[in-house]
Every structure is written in C-alpha cells, then in structure tokens.
Amino acid sequence: MYDFFMTWLLPFLIIVGKTLLLLVVLLVLVAYLLYADRKIWAAVQLRRGPNVVGPWGLLQSFADLIKFVVKEPIIPAGANKGVFLLAPFVSATLALSTWAVIPVSEGWEVAKINVGLLYILAISSLEVYGVIMGGWASNSKYPFLGALRSAAQMVSYEVSIGFVLVTVILISGSLDLTTIVLKQGQGLGTTLGLPFNSFLDWNWLVLFPMFIIFFISALAETNRPPFDLVEAESELVAGHMVEYSSTPYMLFFLGEYVAIVLMCALTTILFLGGWLPPLDVWWLNWIPGVIWFVLKVCFVFFWFAIVKAFVPRYRYDQLMRLGWKVFLPLSLAMVVITAAFLKFTNFV
C-alpha cells in the first residue's frame, strides 16, 4: 500500500494540485490583463474605461463572468447542436492545455518534458479546429466565413512562427523551454566582456529580426488587431462567434485570451530571458523568478494592447501578402544565416 501511494497516488495528486493552481493563477491573470487591455484602449480614446465594479473597476472582469454564466445559451434552429456546444469547449481546453509545459520559473511547470516547444506548436495548431467547428455548426454564412478566415490566417503565420522557433532551437541547442531560458546567458553582453550578465544576453538582441517577426506573427496567430479579420466588426460582426451567447461565448473568449497570454509567455521565454532578472546582481536575484516572468508577460501584453489601440486593421489580401511574401522568405533566410553562422563560429 505504501509503495502504491508513493509510486502512483502521490505523483498523481501532485500533478492535480499543480494543474489546479496553474488554472486559478492563469484565469486571474487573464481577468486582470483583460481589464488592463480595456483600460489602455480607453486611455487612448480619452475615456475612463471600467470604473464601476469594485475599486477602480478591478472586479469588472468577474462581473462579466457572472453575467455570461447566468444568461441563457441560445442555440440557432438550424445549428448542429452537438458540434455547436462542443466547439467552445475544444477551443478553451486546447488553449489551457498548452500551459502544461510553460515554466514560470526554474522547475515551476506542471509537466517537465524535453520537447516542450514541439508540444506547444502541436497543440496550438489544433486550436483552429474549435473555431472551424463553431463556424460550421452555426449554419450561418458569417460564422462560416470567419472560421475559414481563421484557418487560412493561422496556417499562414504558423509557418513563419515555426521558422522562428527553429532559429531559437539552433541558438539554444534544445527543445526544452527551461534550457532555452538558461542558455540566454551567452549573448552579446558576455561577448563584450561585461562584468555581469544582463538583458543584452537575451535572444531579443541576437535574433532581433526574428523577434519582430515572432511578435507580429503572434498578433496574427491570436487574431489580435490589426489582424482581427476573423471577427471584423465592420463586416463579419463577431466572426465565428456571431451565433454564440452565454457560457459558450465566454469559453471562446477565454480560449482567445489564454492563447494571447500564451504568446506573451512564449515571447518572454524565447527572447526576453524568461524568469531571469535584467541584470545579474544580488539585489535583483533576490526577487523570485516567477515575479520577473509575470512582469515580462505583462510588458509584452502592454505592447499587444498598444498595437490594438494605434494600428488600423489590415485588408485580407495585405494579411496574406505579409505572411507569405514577406515573413516566410525572411524567416527562412534567417534560419539559413543562423545555421551558417553557428557552423563557422564558436558563438554557442
């Protein structure tokens, strides 16, 4: 009995506890990043934004959650009921499951696997199925058009994201996210002979063109402005979510924002040193790594919100041209250049 407890039951309970803790922290983080997104957009438009529910409107996201849950879900008469209700659960579940391998600090992840980057790429590629299922099952042309746009958009920019990940793998020599973070101490700062490691060692400087490509591709992959063609209000209203209401709509919305925060976390891990402090000095190392990680995720999300507020929406042909005629050749060329550079130098 003791062997069973130590070998099977205890590890299972630890994983369940980690998963529940991650879900709670992630959902609270999403709630307040959504609040920050609305506040930033309001400030740009000279409005106050959420300010009624709770002090300074801090509980607005939780009030919205209650509003969605207590509403009645309406299913269109001609919809495929089973697929219609399953689609938002697929979208939200896949978005949440990608966080299983995200290390918020060294040793702080639900599942430690040595191909974490490949796992994230595989699971995030499946998220489009929830959108397609929702658009098709609604039995309406506008959701279906939004779903088709989403599929084309995600396929177009996943190729560029894949090549960006290849360059990071070449630099770090690993698919393990923890190793990728720890390897970011061999960049330009160390080469210049600085007395301590700094943010100059991180991949954002060494792979700056790929950093920009990844950031813009992340906007397109998550349907954020200026690439929100999937739910363009002026033409498709809410895209694949037109016929949804109540909890199913909330699940689609949750999956979308969890994917956005995931891209912010990936940007932090791949290019901004993960949980490493900006300067390797004792008074910054004293701060827990998870605090640095969350601060960097919030910093990246701030730029997501700024782009949403300032950049006008692209046309669909411009979106496709940028993905296939600009980012794809550039990212492929950078893979070749990075591989050649590493082959003939001792940089890594």
UniProtKB/Swiss-Prot annotation:
GO terms for molecular function: NADH dehydrogenase activity; oxidoreductase activity, acting on NAD(P)H, quinone or similar compound as acceptor; quinone binding. Its main location: membrane. It catalyses: a quinone + NADH + 5 H(+)(in) = a quinol + NAD(+) + 4 H(+)(out). It is found in: Cell inner membrane. It is a multi-pass membrane protein. The chain crosses the membrane at residues 10-30, 82-102, 115-135, 161-181, 199-219, 251-271, 287-307, 322-342. InterPro entries: NADH_UbQ_OxRdtase_su1/FPO (IPR001694), NADH_UbQ_OxRdtase_su1_CS (IPR018086). Its EC number is 7.1.1.-. Pfam families: NADHdh. GO terms for biological process: aerobic respiration. GO terms for cellular component: plasma membrane. Keywords: Cell inner membrane, Cell membrane, Membrane, NAD, Quinone, Translocase, Transmembrane, Transmembrane helix, Ubiquinone. It comes from the Bacteria. The keyword Membrane applies. The keyword Repeat does not apply. NCBIfam families: PRK06076.1-2, PRK06076.1-6. NDH-1 is composed of 14 different subunits. Subunits NuoA, H, J, K, L, M, N constitute the membrane sector of the complex. NDH-1 shuttles electrons from NADH, via FMN and iron-sulfur (Fe-S) centers, to quinones in the respiratory chain. The immediate electron acceptor for the enzyme in this species is believed to be ubiquinone. Couples the redox reaction to proton translocation (for every two electrons transferred, four hydrogen ions are translocated across the cytoplasmic membrane), and thus conserves the redox energy in a proton gradient. This subunit may bind ubiquinone. HAMAP family: NDH1_NuoH. Belongs to the complex I subunit 1 family. This is NADH-quinone oxidoreductase subunit H. It comes from Bartonella tribocorum (strain CIP 105476 / IBS 506). The lineage of its organism: Bacteria, Pseudomonadati, Pseudomonadota, Alphaproteobacteria, Hyphomicrobiales. The gene is nuoH.
